[in-house]
Amino acid sequence: MDKRILLTLALGAMSQVFTHAWEPKGDKIKTVWAEQVTPENVWQSYPRPQLQRAEWINLNGLWKYAVTDQNTSRKNVSFEGEILVPFAIESSLSGVQKTFLPTDKLWYQREFSLDPSWKNKSAILHFGAVDYECQVWVNNRLVGTHKGGNNPFSFDITKYLKKSGPQSIEVAVTDPTDTESISRGKQQLNQEGIWYTPVSGIWQTVWLEAVNKTYIRQVLPSTDIERKSVKLAFDIAGAKGNEEVKIEVLDDGKVIKTVEQKLTNAMEIDVPNAVLWSPESPKLYHLNIVLSNGGRVLDRVKSYFALRKVDVRKDECGYNRICLNNQPIFQYGPLDQGWWPDGLLTPPSEEAMLWDMVQLKKMGFNMIRKHIKVEPEQYYYYADSLGLMM
């Protein structure tokens, strides 16, 4: 047989082995979205709607993993297989579905490459959530640690990167679950009654973004419905004190207001023909923000806001009432645990998460009582877009 044909067949066989290596584990009930999940398409959308940048790398997908006792050192770790990030090791969609004990340590490892356009820029490594305590290494150097299973965190890994070639990330995780007094929701090692399967390790998106030395770390909008304005508070990393900012306010994709001025800690912008947000009319305004210095662009981000006001007022009988835009509002919604049979705390996909919310809206609910869980940041953007109070 032609050697080229043999080589093609061999490569094809290798490709099939790699493609079919991952699959959901276990025979427990799964959602219809489970069969659509692949290592190539898992949670690929930009993970932070409130502050979006163009240059980023999604690190979800297959990572090497190992489970050891907590006394095992990094140099003695032998990886035993692959795990699909961002699903917890106990979940079916991780491809592992193993019980993880408080005496265990979970190790992750993967490689990535940087685009040449990232040269002379800083690289920020983001974790949406890791349950519960973790250490992170880049190219065999400890970058930092984090404790807490629900909140996002990040590290500037620029100084740990090699000038070229593949870069390596390793993560080590421990999780006491219910053996310590920590924020764990309904996780319990012995599932019974109202208690659920534990969630250990990476369970939200891991990603990298490129920024300049001076960049927008955070933009926080707060609105005033009486003044029909939005105030933007900025947190700027590496600010020199002479930066300028250009802000465009967009309504349905059309620029309705442009402001250019020297950057200050907080800026108030009037919104022309302002429309208030409500569950019946969930109006969102979008922002294009450009940070510059002497004509040189330092950063470009997108964000959004809604004109609304939530407070508590006395009614005619003297009872406290929650009000939206100065009017009492009856909140009608379910207690939502946010657990999935196949992904546990992690929805199998963004489509699955959105479908759930759309159905609640169709049922006539105007709010969701999210129960002992912090969702991925996309969840709250969809709530704003659909008209669901949280």
Which residue stretches match the model-derived regions?
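Accessory beta-strand-rich segments of carbohydrate-active enzymes
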Residues: K64-T68, K98-T99, T103-Y215, A239, ...
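Conserved, mostly hydrophobic/aromatic
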Residues: W63, N140, V206, Y285, ...
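Short hydrophobic beta-strand segments in globular cytosolic domains
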Residues: V143-G144, I256, I329
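Active-site mouth of glycoside hydrolases
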Residues: W137, K147-Y160, D178-L189, G193-Y196, ...
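N-terminal pre-domain segments of enzymes
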Residues: W22-W56
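Bacterial Sec-dependent N-terminal signal peptides
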Residues: M1-E23
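Beta-strand-rich binding/interaction modules
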Residues: V138, K228-Q261, L287
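Surface beta-strand/loop "capping" patches
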Residues: A210-K240, E316-R321
